Each structure stands twice: as structure tokens, then as C-alpha cells.
Amino acid sequence: MPGRWGRGRFRAVGKIIGIDLGTTNSLVAIVESGIPLVLADGQGRRLTPSVVRVPSAGEPVVGWEAKRARAAHPETTITSIKRFMGRRCDEVDSATDSPAYPIRANGSTPVAVSLHGREWSPEELSAEILKALRAIAAEGMIDRPEAAVITVPAYFNDAQRNSTRKAGELAGLRVERIINEPTAAALAYGLNSLKEKTKVAVYDLGGGTFDLSILELNKGVFQVLATCGNTRLGGDDIDRAL
């Protein structure tokens, strides 16, 4: 979600925020006078690691603090939970989907993370990340954010999109729309202002995947014509290979 890096307080129209809920890092932004502004936290950081630590007592810890705790507490520090959104246990590949934290992956029930005697759904853990992003937005906006547009990979199926929407609702947000990441990228770079019918190629090298999408712009409306990629060629996979 490119754009100017926002600091200070802004009055966002309609109290709607845009969220890039990523596999490894996430961002929150608003639109000010037609320009996307990525909001920073109190320490000036625009990226929020998509990491949640669930201690045995107390509330979950999200972001940089959770990431720092990963080395000492890998079994209770949840990373790359986006990979499990909307997936059933029988869809999990034990060879490639083997995190350090314990997951329940038996049968055809939804994937869950087992910690401290309870099971956490991917939606619940993603909601913790979204709550942290909402808090960052609340610090930078005059009006409390109540609604959000959340991006998802173009290849996400209905179950994965519904899981993302549910995570937003668990975070206390009204999810106005789920949009494809390539479309969000094209909008952020102002390609919707092009006057002529245009086809655009968008490459997305993220923490979980490497994708190529072909978009067609016609009168300000984007349509995803085709998308192709490798769901096991993201930054996580490169790190694991190294």
C-alpha cells in the first residue's frame, strides 16, 4: 500500500482505513485528499510484523514486541498465520506447513493453533493483528476508525476471503470491502486515473507468495483478467531455504 508516510493527525473521510494484512508484515493507511497515506506507530514505524505471541497469562502481544520474543518463545509466537486462513486440516501440507507452534491439522475441520489448553482459529489470531493496526490508525486520526477495506491475494478463494472478513469483524471493524492486492497496488499508484483502456501487469513478491496478475482498467474500474503464481515462493520460503 504505497503512498506518503503519514505522521500527525488526519481527518479521514468516513473513518475508513485501508489495511494490507500481510503474511510477514502489515500496514494501515488512509486516503487524504486523494493520496494514500501509510500511518506510523508512536515510534515512527510504518510496518507492523504480522506476529502474535500468546503468553500463558495476560493478553496476546502483537508486532515488534512479539517478533523479538520469537527466538526465546517460538512455540507460543505465531507467524505467517495468513497461510492458514480459510483452510481445512486436510489441505495442510506437513512438508511445507510446519511452523514451530503447534497446530491441529487432523481431518477436515478448520486449522487451529493449540496453545495453553485452548485452540485459536486463524481468524482470532489475525484479529489481534488487525486490532493493533486499528490502534495505530486511532493514534493518527481525529475520528476513531470504524470500518476498513482489507486486501487479500487475488487467488484467495471464498473461504479465505470470508475468514479475512471475519477477522476484521472480530477486531471490531466493519469490513466494507475485501479487494485483491494487485488492484490495491494499482489504485495506490494512481493507475485508475489513466484515461484509456489499459492492461497492467502487477508482480507481488510477498512473505507467502510470488504472484503475477494481469489487470484491465476501463473507465476507472479494474478487472483481474488472470493471475498466476507460486504459493510456496514467498519471503518465508526463501528464508527457510537459506
Predicted regions located by residue number:
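Oxyanion-binding/catalytic loops of NTP- or PPi-dependent enzymes
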Residues: 2-108, 116-123, 127-128, 135-242
